[in-house]
Structure formats: structure tokens, C-alpha cells
């Protein structure tokens, strides 16, 4: 529920001053590289498909990384997780992999990585999928995530290891889901398989 930059309107400025390889950089304002065709091709995509820009939405996700961030083991992943929330709440559209994803459909993109990597060493997109599916039908919904992130960003308390941070997040999700639903929720045992957890441990060790 926090608002970045004291609620001021966020500008997106095209710039030739970005280092080579950067598509855009989060901040106030967001800087968008005009060294290549990113700006032109993005506006062509918006006109053709009625989409928002995946890349700019990703940078907006970084902008909403507020407060204590000691719990956050990978903000590239969590920037996309915040983007998923924004797309779902507004039925926003993005163009990726030669198709349009609307709202929660974006999770289908991350499921591909989950399916391809979970039985070896799941990648960050696969972890995003496992967390993202929790917020959908049959899961715990978004409210426990909001409460957990609010607690993490205001009070801290997360351990130092990446996998330990992951488990700590699950424990907070369990606590808040139990409080909000009135039923006993253990996210780790009820929504993750042993294969899921072993694969995540390999990635985050």
C-alpha cells in the first residue's frame, strides 16, 4: 500500500546517456534508452496490440521496491512479481513471446520456465510462477502477500541466506493467510511439493 516518491507523478524520459546494454533504468524518473530502437518499437507494439510495455512495467516494479529490503533475495524477480499484480488488478496487456498476455495470463509465461526447470534446478522465473500461483484461484489470494510484504518492509527480521529468506516469506504468508481466512494455512506444506522445495533450494543455496 506504500506510494513511491511521495505520490508524485512518475516521469519516463528517453535518454541517450544510458550505458550500452541497458534498455531502461528504474528511478525518478525512469530513464529509457533511445540509443537503439526500443522507444520506436515499443510505441509500434502499443499501437498494434493495445499493450503496455513489459520492459517499462518491469522498471515500475523496481520503483515500488520500498522500505526495508533485507528480505529481498532477488529484486529482478520481485519487480516482475509486482508487475504481475499490476497487470491482474487492471487487466493490463503485455506483448512477450510473440503473443499478448492479459492480466493473470502473464503467469503462463513463467509456467514454461517452471515446467522446464523444476526437476533439475528451477530458475527465478519458475520461482515467480510458484509464488504467483499462490495468489490465484485455489491459493491464498493477494491479501496475505500484501500483509507479508508490509511486515517485511517495515519491520525486517529476515535471515541472511537466500533460501532462508524464501522460507521466512512462506512463514509470513502462512501466518497472514491463517489470520485472514480463519483456517489453518501452512503454505510450505500445502502448496509446494518436495520436488518444488528441493529445486528452489538448489537455485537459492
Residue ranges of predicted features:
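Short, Lys/Arg-enriched charge-dense amphipathic segments
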Residues: 22-42, 91-101, 116-121, 173, ...
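Juxtacatalytic substrate-recognition/specificity segment
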Residues: 1-57
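Non-catalytic terminal regions of proteins
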Residues: 196-205
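Active-site-proximal alpha-helical
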Residues: 104-197
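Loop/turn elements at helix/coil->beta-strand transitions in domains of secreted/extracellular proteins
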Residues: 1-10, 59-62, 87-91, 138-145, ...
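A residue-identity detector for tryptophan
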Residues: 23, 32, 52, 71-73, ...
Amino acid at each position: 500500500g506504500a506510494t513511491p516518491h511521495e505520490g508524485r507523478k512518475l516521469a519516463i524520459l528517453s535518454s541517450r546517456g544510458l550505458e550500452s546494454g541497458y534498455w531502461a533504468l528504474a528511478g525518478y524518473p525512469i530513464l529509457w534508452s533511445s540509443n537503439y530502437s526500443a522507444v520506436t518499437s515499443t510505441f509500434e507494439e502499443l499501437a498494434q496490440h493495445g499493450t503496455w510495455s513489459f520492459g517499462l512495467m518491469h522498471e515500475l516494479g523496481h520503483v515500488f521496491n520500498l522500505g526495508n529490503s533485507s528480505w529481498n533475495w532477488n529484486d529482478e524477480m520481485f519487480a516482475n512479481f509486482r508487475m504481475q499484480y499490476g497487470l491482474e488488478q487492471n487487466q493490463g496487456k503485455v506483448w512477450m513471446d510473440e503473443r499478448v498476455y492479459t492480466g493473470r495470463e502473464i503467469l503462463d509465461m513463467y509456467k514454461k520456465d517452471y515446467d522446464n526447470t523444476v526437476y533439475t534446478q528451477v530458475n527465478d522465473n519458475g520461482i515467480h510462477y510458484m509464488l504467483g500461483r499462490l495468489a490465484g484461484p485455489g491459493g491464498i489470494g493477494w491479501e496475505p502477500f500484501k500483509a507479508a510484504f508490509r511486515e517485511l518492509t517495515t519491520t525486517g527480521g529476515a535471515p541472511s541466506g537466500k533460501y532462508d529468506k524464501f522460507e521466512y516469506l512462506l512463514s509470513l504468508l502462512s501466518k497472514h493467510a491463517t489470520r485472514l481466512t480463519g483456517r489453518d494455512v501452512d503454505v510450505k506444506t500445502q502448496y509446494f511439493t518436495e520436488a518444488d522445495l528441493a529445486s528452489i533450494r538448489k537455485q537459492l543455496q
